[in-house]
Amino acid sequence: MTGIIAHRGYSKLFPENTMLAFKEAAKFDITGIELDVQLTKDSHVIICHDETIDRTSNGSGLIKDMTLEDLKSLYFYGKFKGQVEENADIQIPTLEEFFQWFKPLDIMVNIELKTNIFRYEGLVEKVNELIQQFDLFDRVILSSFQHHTMNTAKKVNPKLKTGLLTVSGTLQPGNYTASHGHDYYHPFFMTLEAEDMENLTANKIGVNTYTVNSTEDMKKLIDAKVTNIITDDVALGLQVLNASK
């Protein structure tokens, strides 16, 4: 059965990658949450999609040049400025803070490591330490567009579940993913073809597609039997999924 993963939390209705968006998503019968991590100047693992905070907060600058204290002084309301209360739930969360809240829940989390532009040396190791600290290996999937980052993750700890993100698709994606020792393939949904699903299924590779926000596209992917659909619209995803049963 296909599951629904909340992209950056319930990001259609709440500020992305905030505890508010995560808590609102968890009120629904979701399979999991997707989020993005980066490293601060003082080496804290924080949750944010962009390398800069300009789009999502009332501040400006690169995350790598700011301390956690700098970042915690800001509010990450994004496009919802004036629509949400300025409190701790829309301050930037650390991955540790997220795990403290997440640990008692019965859902999984997909953590994208944002190593596309900056390498963030030590990020993989710090994320692994936090997963180990909270004993969450069976509930976490790491993913990245930088496949060497996922190769590093498997070397750091073979227990880590890893997924390969792609924008334009991959020839024989099941063979490719399996040959590199990874567990999941995360394609942009429009690039996923029937023969890709056959190849992935034959190699026992899970398929988590992003970012799917229309009823028609969700129906097609449910029919294709993808593992999970990553969506901004949690309510729509569950509505379409339940109607397909």
Task: Give, region by region, the residue ranges found by the protein language model.
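Phosphate-group recognition and catalysis centered on beta-loop-alpha active-site segments
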Residues: 1-245
